[in-house]
């Protein structure tokens, strides 16, 4: 997958990037509820799983916008990937640990769903942190905390503040006013992502969840 270098001197985000990366290092998170009433009903009718469906929605929106694909490469150069693949957590009930498994993204949901099922079949019972080798650099991290319908979630990453890729966390869905809602938290780096961008993410994720008939397809 191609990594496109960014010319910082000719980049409209240069002053914001330098300020929030160097002067005032700043990451932040936002949590919002996604309504999944119709989506949940439809995937149950089709015998599909909710988790990979939500992973697909997240990755689809990420791949629409460069700010969610911007990062430093292994040489420390700034740029953005053409597209991203999801790396997601799978819980092991027997020993209360989890694995992180990555799946190749496909904009066609049935094909992505098939890829997910194959990876789950091959790796979900392997009690390793990262049982599937060869994880590419162009991945986003998705995790699930399906035991709590939280109202806020924050990750504290202690490094040199150069991790620019967003991190997504899903909570337990619940019913409110005849609607099924699911909390979703997104952690971003302010150097590459502002409030407008993260708000657009939530709005587009909700749009996909509401208009599931346009992409869900046949099982």
Swiss-Prot record:
Q: What is its EC number?
A: 2.3.1.28
Give any Pfam family that matches.
Answer: CAT
Alphabetic keyword roster? Acyltransferase, Antibiotic resistance, Transferase
Which PROSITE patterns does the record associate with it?
CAT
Q: Which reaction does it catalyse?
A: chloramphenicol + acetyl-CoA = chloramphenicol 3-acetate + CoA
Please name the GO terms of the biological process aspect recorded for this protein, alphabetically.
response to antibiotic
Q: Write out the catalytic residues in the record.
A: 190 (proton acceptor)
GO MF annotation, one: chloramphenicol O-acetyltransferase activity
**Subunit:** Homotrimer.
Main role?
This enzyme is an effector of chloramphenicol resistance in bacteria.
Name the family the entry cites: Belongs to the chloramphenicol acetyltransferase family.
Question: NCBIfam families, from UniProt?
Answer: chloram_CatA
Q: What is this protein called?
A: Chloramphenicol acetyltransferase
This chain's source organism reads Clostridium perfringens
């Amino acid at each position: 997958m191609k990594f496109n270098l960014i010319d910082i001197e000719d980049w409209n985000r240069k002053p914001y990037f330098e300020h929030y990366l160097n002067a005032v290092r700043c990451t932040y998170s936002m949590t919002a509820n996604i309504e999944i009433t119709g989506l949940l009903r439809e995937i149950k009718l089709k015998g599909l799983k909710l988790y990979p469906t939500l992973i697909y929605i997240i990755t689809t929106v990420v791949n629409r916008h460069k700010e969610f694909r911007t990062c430093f490469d292994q040489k420390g150069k700034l740029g953005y990937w053409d597209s991203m693949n999801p790396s997601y957590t799978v819980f092991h009930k027997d020993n209360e640990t989890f694995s992180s498994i990555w799946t190749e993204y496909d904009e066609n949901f049935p094909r992505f769903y098939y890829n997910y099922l194959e990876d789950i079949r091959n790796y979900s019972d392997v009690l390793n942190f990262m049982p599937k080798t060869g994880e590419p650099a162009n991945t986003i991290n998705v995790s699930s905390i399906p035991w709590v319908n939280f109202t806020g979630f924050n990750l504290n990453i202690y490094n040199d503040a150069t991790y620019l890729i967003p991190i997504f966390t899903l909570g337990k869905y619940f019913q409110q006013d005849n609607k099924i809602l699911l909390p979703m938290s997104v952690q971003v780096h302010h150097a590459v992502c502002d409030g407008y961008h993260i708000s657009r993410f939530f709005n587009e994720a909700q749009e996909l969840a509401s208009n599931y008939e346009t992409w869900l397809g046949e099982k």
